[in-house]
Amino acid sequence: MTINTDDQYGDAESKTTISSSRRYSSSSYQDQSMDDALNTTLTNDKATLIQVWKPKSYGSVKGQIPQCERLTYTWKEIDVFGEAPTDGKPREPLCTRLRNCCTRQRKDFNPRKHLLKNVTGVAKSGELLAVMGSSGAGKTTLLNALAFRSPPGVKISPNAVRALNGVPVNAEQLRARCAYVQQDDLFIPSLTTREHLLFQAMLRMGRDVPASVKQHRVQEVLQELSLVKCADTIIGAPGRIKGLSGGERKRLAFASETLTDPHLLLCDEPTSGLDSFMAHSVLQVLKGMAMKGKTIILTIHQPSSELYCLFDKILLVAEGRVAFLGSPYQSAEFFSQLGIPCPPNYNPADFYVQMLAIAPAKEAECRDMIKKICDSFAVSPIAREVLETASVAGKGMDEPYMLQQVEGVGSTGYRSSWWTQFYCILWRSWLSVLKDPMLVKVRLLQTAMVATLIGSIYFGQVLDQDGVMNINGSLFLFLTNMTFQNVFAVINVFSAELPVFLREKRSRLYRVDTYFLGKTIAELPLFIAVPFVFTSITYPMIGLRTGATHYLTTLFIVTLVANVSTSFGYLISCASSSISMALSVGPPVVIPFLIFGGFFLNSASVPAYFKYLSYLSWFRYANEALLINQWSTVVDGEIACTRANVTCPRSEIILETFNFRVEDFALDIACLFALIVLFRLGALLCLWLRSRSKE
């Protein structure tokens, strides 16, 4: 098929007339209001600039956005490169990678692939702009670049300019005025819709906004996005916990981002995984936001013709280049002038995506077609108009006005204080613990069943030669059970929540330390209740040392072990990239510490090259403390001899057999506390490094 690149598409005046009268417009005020918004922001009057960026009040969801507060987002010369492959190249030392991560410095790399090539565009207030293209065309890459959220290993050219109302912005300035709804919906499954939005409102809205205003704002958003009927329904997890439907989850994601009433909204594949009805309802919500004056940019793979009619502008991307940017009416005219008109009664979106896709076995022909289409658009009057609009960034503007403090945002870039962040994380984590049956009911039932089984096996031990060995084995089994039960419980729960943390941290909802402290403190009562149930059942059944002091000491030691193993589980979870990896790493790492516990290998027989590693074994300190508590007060003759020609064991001999000393009891307790602190600090460091690597 031959493309005619000599035809023109009419002058700007006729094109404006066609655009303003096209049937895709939602209301007659949009074209005039968008032109007025752009002209207003291009003035040199500083008073006008101050008016544009003045703090707005919350709760304007249902009303029109004032003209002075509307945003036009422009971008120019966006070039994005992928990271060079490392095959055959030596990897940097660990210390170098840690230093680079801490200082946010990355090594230079040679471009592997030119992902986006000189992309320029504009999105005006009151418009719903849809970015379309085939898989791998660069839609999500472009949206990430516009949101300043490109993943690690992706480099954006320094010449790229992103501007709001003609004023160049950086990541912090855009984040304060923009919301980004990502493709994957990540929530805490056990929370209700209202609880999730209350948590988001407490952290997203300004620190000076009263709590009553935040609660009122949550109710407003629930009504605006038709979430009132499911406000008290748990969110759930698809395929695991019954909860919200796909459309409700997507609207909840919008609700979370629109609590602060941002005037610029970026959405990555908002209809992904939804049926046609749900997809239409979601886009109707976005269309309604645009009609009120918001600027909406979304990516969509292949919309139906019904959805296509909702778009005010479309941006076609192919092979990292802009193939078209304009109204649906202009797109039909553009492709007709090229000699490839959309057939009658055919979905234009399907037609454009097919024309810009790389078909198997026809790569060269398809790439040649894409190149001709992109080249034709680059020299068209539509592209020149877009370039002129995007080129005004910084002209006649006094950039320091963009650097003024946004309402409610502190000097650290967070909208809420440290204490508010900690309180909200603690509140959400505590609700999650109480409402998740796997965390409380199932774990306590499991603990009671295991304790009853162990108590039945070792039931009624007497103080003789066999009883001493059995009691020593049962006490070490206390430690083994507490360790594996809590390590795997933490890995399954904490690792599953890490993606939510990483996304919320990148949105600057809270700090790493507030999240870690709030999360671990909220789960602390559970890790006290589990050893209490276990010890209270097994201790009397086995017949361990009588007396409240001995029982409470055993309970205290077992509780310490439960929290040491929990801390170690946090460390493994934060250092692992996935749940499967953490579950695979956990047992091999725990086994050496178990061997160094003194039951399988005498502490005096530990090889010299493993001596320092044995100091990190909580089995060693806890086993010694438990045996001291059990045998140190046993007097001579209390242990009976049931077999002839056998020396009756004494308490000193029992402890010396393991190379344990009574005077080390206090040191053992101190070491258990030290390991809790050490492992949790290590987990916090790993969590901080992971969050930094994602920014």
UniProtKB/Swiss-Prot annotation:
Positions of glycan attachment: 472, 645
Biased composition (Low complexity): 19-29
TM helices/strands, residue ranges: 444-464, 474-494, 524-544, 552-572, 581-601, 669-689
First-listed, main subcellular location of the protein, grouped into a coarse class: membrane
Membrane topology recorded in Swiss-Prot or TrEMBL: Multi-pass membrane protein
GO cellular component: cytoplasmic vesicle membrane; plasma membrane
InterPro entries: AAA+_ATPase (IPR003593), ABC2_TM (IPR013525), ABC_transporter-like_ATP-bd (IPR003439), ABC_transporter-like_CS (IPR017871), ABCG_dom (IPR043926), ABCG_transporters (IPR050352), P-loop_NTPase (IPR027417), Pigment_permease/Abcg (IPR005284)
GO BP terms in the entry: transmembrane transport
Keywords, in A-Z order: ATP-binding, Glycoprotein, Membrane, Nucleotide-binding, Pigment, Transmembrane, Transmembrane helix, Transport
All copies of domain ABC transporter, residue ranges: 96-344
Residues the record lists as binding ATP: 133-140
Family affiliation: Belongs to the ABC transporter superfamily. ABCG family. Eye pigment precursor importer (TC 3.A.1.204) subfamily.
Its job: May be part of a membrane-spanning permease system necessary for the transport of pigment precursors into pigment cells responsible for eye color.
Name of the protein in its database record: Protein white
Organism: Anopheles gambiae (African malaria mosquito)
Gene: w
